UniProtKB/Swiss-Prot annotation:
Chief localization: membrane
GO cellular component: plasma membrane; proton-transporting ATP synthase complex
Record SUPFAM superfamilies: N-terminal domain of the delta subunit of the F1F0-ATP synthase
Topological type in the membrane: Peripheral membrane protein
Gene name of the encoded protein: atpH
Protein known as: ATP synthase subunit delta
Length: 177
Protein backbone atom coordinates (compact mmCIF):
# COMPACT_ATOMS: atom_id res chain seq x y z
CA UNK A 1 0.00 0.00 0.00
CA UNK A 2 2.72 2.47 0.97
CA UNK A 3 4.73 1.62 -2.14
CA UNK A 4 1.65 2.43 -4.25
CA UNK A 5 1.32 5.78 -2.54
CA UNK A 6 5.02 6.40 -3.04
CA UNK A 7 4.70 5.44 -6.73
CA UNK A 8 1.85 7.93 -7.14
CA UNK A 9 3.91 10.68 -5.49
CA UNK A 10 6.92 9.96 -7.70
CA UNK A 11 4.69 9.82 -10.80
CA UNK A 12 3.08 13.18 -9.96
CA UNK A 13 6.50 14.76 -9.45
CA UNK A 14 7.86 13.33 -12.71
CA UNK A 15 4.83 14.43 -14.72
CA UNK A 16 5.17 17.93 -13.27
CA UNK A 17 8.84 18.11 -14.23
CA UNK A 18 8.21 16.59 -17.68
CA UNK A 19 5.38 19.04 -18.35
CA UNK A 20 7.51 22.00 -17.32
CA UNK A 21 10.23 20.85 -19.75
CA UNK A 22 7.70 20.12 -22.55
CA UNK A 23 8.72 16.47 -22.50
CA UNK A 24 5.56 14.84 -21.10
CA UNK A 25 4.82 12.89 -24.31
CA UNK A 26 8.36 11.60 -24.63
CA UNK A 27 8.50 10.64 -20.94
CA UNK A 28 5.11 8.92 -21.34
CA UNK A 29 6.59 6.80 -24.12
CA UNK A 30 9.57 6.04 -21.86
CA UNK A 31 7.29 5.05 -18.98
CA UNK A 32 5.24 2.80 -21.26
CA UNK A 33 8.46 1.14 -22.43
CA UNK A 34 9.67 0.73 -18.83
CA UNK A 35 6.36 -0.74 -17.62
CA UNK A 36 6.08 -3.21 -20.50
CA UNK A 37 9.75 -4.21 -20.26
CA UNK A 38 9.54 -4.86 -16.52
CA UNK A 39 6.24 -6.74 -16.85
CA UNK A 40 7.45 -8.91 -19.73
CA UNK A 41 10.99 -9.58 -18.48
CA UNK A 42 10.99 -11.52 -15.22
CA UNK A 43 14.79 -11.41 -14.98
CA UNK A 44 14.80 -7.61 -15.01
CA UNK A 45 11.95 -7.49 -12.49
CA UNK A 46 13.78 -9.93 -10.19
CA UNK A 47 16.98 -7.90 -10.56
CA UNK A 48 15.18 -4.65 -9.61
CA UNK A 49 13.34 -6.26 -6.68
CA UNK A 50 16.42 -8.03 -5.27
CA UNK A 51 17.52 -6.23 -2.08
CA UNK A 52 20.98 -7.85 -2.11
CA UNK A 53 22.00 -6.14 -5.35
CA UNK A 54 23.58 -2.75 -4.77
CA UNK A 55 21.55 0.26 -5.88
CA UNK A 56 24.54 1.52 -7.90
CA UNK A 57 24.41 -1.66 -10.00
CA UNK A 58 20.67 -1.24 -10.48
CA UNK A 59 21.04 2.37 -11.61
CA UNK A 60 23.85 1.51 -14.03
CA UNK A 61 21.91 -1.43 -15.46
CA UNK A 62 18.76 0.66 -15.96
CA UNK A 63 20.73 3.48 -17.57
CA UNK A 64 22.21 0.90 -19.95
CA UNK A 65 18.92 -0.89 -20.71
CA UNK A 66 17.03 2.38 -21.17
CA UNK A 67 19.89 4.39 -22.70
CA UNK A 68 17.69 6.13 -25.29
CA UNK A 69 15.26 7.62 -22.78
CA UNK A 70 14.63 11.26 -21.98
CA UNK A 71 16.78 13.07 -19.40
CA UNK A 72 13.74 13.39 -17.10
CA UNK A 73 13.41 9.60 -17.10
CA UNK A 74 17.12 9.21 -16.39
CA UNK A 75 16.79 11.69 -13.52
CA UNK A 76 14.08 9.41 -12.08
CA UNK A 77 16.60 6.55 -12.07
CA UNK A 78 19.06 8.74 -10.17
CA UNK A 79 16.37 9.82 -7.70
CA UNK A 80 15.42 6.19 -7.08
CA UNK A 81 19.15 5.45 -6.61
CA UNK A 82 19.45 8.20 -3.98
CA UNK A 83 16.31 7.05 -2.16
CA UNK A 84 16.96 3.30 -2.65
CA UNK A 85 13.46 2.75 -4.10
CA UNK A 86 14.11 0.91 -7.38
CA UNK A 87 11.57 -1.77 -6.44
CA UNK A 88 8.70 0.64 -7.23
CA UNK A 89 9.92 1.64 -10.71
CA UNK A 90 7.29 -0.46 -12.51
CA UNK A 91 4.52 0.99 -10.34
CA UNK A 92 5.81 4.54 -10.96
CA UNK A 93 5.77 3.95 -14.73
CA UNK A 94 2.19 2.61 -14.60
CA UNK A 95 0.99 5.48 -12.40
CA UNK A 96 2.68 8.03 -14.66
CA UNK A 97 0.83 6.66 -17.68
CA UNK A 98 -2.50 6.75 -15.81
CA UNK A 99 -1.91 10.39 -14.81
CA UNK A 100 -0.76 11.31 -18.32
CA UNK A 101 -3.89 9.79 -19.85
CA UNK A 102 -6.09 11.54 -17.27
CA UNK A 103 -4.50 14.92 -17.95
CA UNK A 104 -4.88 14.46 -21.71
CA UNK A 105 -8.51 13.30 -21.50
CA UNK A 106 -7.74 9.75 -22.56
CA UNK A 107 -9.59 6.81 -21.04
CA UNK A 108 -8.63 3.17 -21.29
CA UNK A 109 -11.45 0.83 -22.24
CA UNK A 110 -10.77 -2.73 -21.13
CA UNK A 111 -12.51 -5.11 -23.49
CA UNK A 112 -12.70 -8.82 -22.73
CA UNK A 113 -13.56 -11.06 -25.68
CA UNK A 114 -13.69 -14.82 -26.24
CA UNK A 115 -11.36 -14.50 -29.24
CA UNK A 116 -9.08 -11.73 -30.49
CA UNK A 117 -11.10 -8.74 -31.70
CA UNK A 118 -11.76 -8.43 -35.43
CA UNK A 119 -12.70 -5.20 -37.24
CA UNK A 120 -16.45 -5.90 -36.96
CA UNK A 121 -16.36 -6.45 -33.18
CA UNK A 122 -14.05 -3.47 -32.71
CA UNK A 123 -16.58 -1.26 -34.53
CA UNK A 124 -19.38 -2.51 -32.24
CA UNK A 125 -17.25 -1.87 -29.16
CA UNK A 126 -16.34 1.64 -30.33
CA UNK A 127 -20.04 2.38 -30.93
CA UNK A 128 -20.84 1.25 -27.38
CA UNK A 129 -17.94 3.28 -26.01
CA UNK A 130 -19.42 6.41 -27.60
CA UNK A 131 -22.49 5.98 -25.35
CA UNK A 132 -20.30 5.65 -22.24
CA UNK A 133 -17.72 8.37 -22.72
CA UNK A 134 -17.11 11.53 -24.70
CA UNK A 135 -13.36 11.32 -24.05
CA UNK A 136 -10.75 9.88 -26.38
CA UNK A 137 -10.59 6.16 -25.63
CA UNK A 138 -7.89 3.57 -26.19
CA UNK A 139 -8.90 -0.08 -26.29
CA UNK A 140 -7.07 -2.71 -24.25
CA UNK A 141 -8.17 -6.20 -25.35
CA UNK A 142 -8.04 -9.31 -23.14
CA UNK A 143 -9.02 -12.75 -24.40
CA UNK A 144 -11.07 -14.97 -22.05
CA UNK A 145 -12.69 -18.01 -23.67
CA UNK A 146 -15.00 -18.53 -20.66
CA UNK A 147 -17.30 -15.70 -21.82
CA UNK A 148 -18.14 -17.91 -24.85
CA UNK A 149 -18.82 -14.97 -27.21
CA UNK A 150 -19.60 -11.26 -27.33
CA UNK A 151 -17.64 -8.86 -25.15
CA UNK A 152 -17.38 -7.25 -21.72
CA UNK A 153 -16.53 -3.55 -21.77
CA UNK A 154 -15.10 -1.70 -18.75
CA UNK A 155 -14.49 2.04 -18.76
CA UNK A 156 -13.61 3.55 -15.42
CA UNK A 157 -16.26 2.35 -12.98
CA UNK A 158 -18.80 1.41 -15.67
CA UNK A 159 -19.25 -2.04 -17.16
CA UNK A 160 -21.31 -3.26 -20.10
CA UNK A 161 -21.60 -7.05 -20.33
CA UNK A 162 -22.64 -8.26 -23.78
CA UNK A 163 -21.17 -11.74 -23.37
CA UNK A 164 -22.93 -14.97 -24.25
CA UNK A 165 -22.08 -16.34 -20.79
CA UNK A 166 -23.90 -13.38 -19.20
CA UNK A 167 -26.92 -13.85 -21.47
CA UNK A 168 -27.07 -17.53 -20.46
CA UNK A 169 -26.91 -16.61 -16.76
CA UNK A 170 -29.74 -14.08 -17.19
CA UNK A 171 -31.81 -16.67 -19.04
CA UNK A 172 -31.12 -19.27 -16.34
CA UNK A 173 -32.30 -16.84 -13.62
CA UNK A 174 -35.44 -15.99 -15.56
CA UNK A 175 -36.29 -19.65 -16.08
CA UNK A 176 -35.69 -20.55 -12.44
CA UNK A 177 -38.09 -17.82 -11.20
Amino acid sequence: MSSTRAAIRYAKAIIEIATSKNAANEVSNDMFLIATTINSNSELDTFIQNPTIKVEAKENALLEVFANTNEVTKSLFHLLFENKRFEILGAIASEYNKLFDEINGIQVAKVTTAIAMDANLEAKVKAKIATFSDKKVTIENTVDASIIGGFILRIGDKQYNASVANRLQVLKRELSN
